[in-house]
Amino acid sequence: MAKDKKDHKHSGSTEDEYDSYLPALMPIAKPLAPKKLNKKMMKTVKKASKQKHILRGVKEVVKAVRKGEKGLVILAGDISPMDVISHIPVLCEDNNVPYLYTVSKELLGEASNTKRPTSCVMIVPGGKKKDMSKVEEYKESYEEIIKEVPALEV
């Protein structure tokens, strides 16, 4: 029975899924990744997660940003209450770390290989051990996302 529910969730296309999450977005969810970039972002998160080059959750992400780790922070745009993650964009700007919002904490959690919805993740190329040999799998899409972030910030 549980499998049927999961199948229903993914039966639509990603565009329909993206649009269905838009009404739940918080007003501070800017810069929000457009559909195409959102899809690329989720694939990159999934690949980075397989290599263990990802930090999940507010506590881990804040700790890494404060320590000066370089990477990409991805925040869920439908977190309630928004105070949970409202300090992270300011922290990222102070430390020159690019950040983006995605439409859903469920999609972000699924992409980062957890069964739970995830409020924020940080892709850290090389991971905690700085093992750059496994970065090649997602490096190209990671760099494309990083290039598109400044254009989205308004």
Swiss-Prot record:
The modification Phosphoserine is found at S119. This is H/ACA ribonucleoprotein complex subunit nhp2. PANTHER family: RIBOSOMAL PROTEIN L7AE FAMILY MEMBER (PTHR23105). Belongs to the eukaryotic ribosomal protein eL8 family. Component of the small nucleolar ribonucleoprotein particles containing H/ACA-type snoRNAs (H/ACA snoRNPs). GO terms for biological process: rRNA pseudouridine synthesis; snRNA pseudouridine synthesis. It holds the Pfam family Ribosomal_L7Ae. InterPro entries: eL8/uL1-like, H/ACA_rnp_Nhp2-like, Ribosomal_eL30-like_sf, Ribosomal_eL8/eL30/eS12/Gad45, Ribosomal_eL8/Nhp2. One of its GO terms (cellular component) is sno(s)RNA-containing ribonucleoprotein complex. The keyword Repressor does not apply. It comes from Schizosaccharomyces pombe (strain 972 / ATCC 24843) (Fission yeast). Keywords: Nucleus, Phosphoprotein, Ribonucleoprotein, Ribosome biogenesis, RNA-binding, rRNA processing. Non-catalytic component of the H/ACA small nucleolar ribonucleoprotein (H/ACA snoRNP), which catalyzes pseudouridylation of rRNA and is required for ribosome biogenesis. This involves the isomerization of uridine such that the ribose is subsequently attached to C5, instead of the normal N1. Pseudouridine ('psi') residues may serve to stabilize the conformation of rRNAs. The H/ACA snoRNP complex also mediates pseudouridylation of other types of RNAs. The H/ACA snoRNP complex mediates pseudouridylation at position 93 in U2 snRNA. Directly binds H/ACA snoRNAs. GO terms for molecular function: box H/ACA snoRNA binding; rRNA binding. The gene is nhp2. It is found in: Nucleus, Nucleolus.
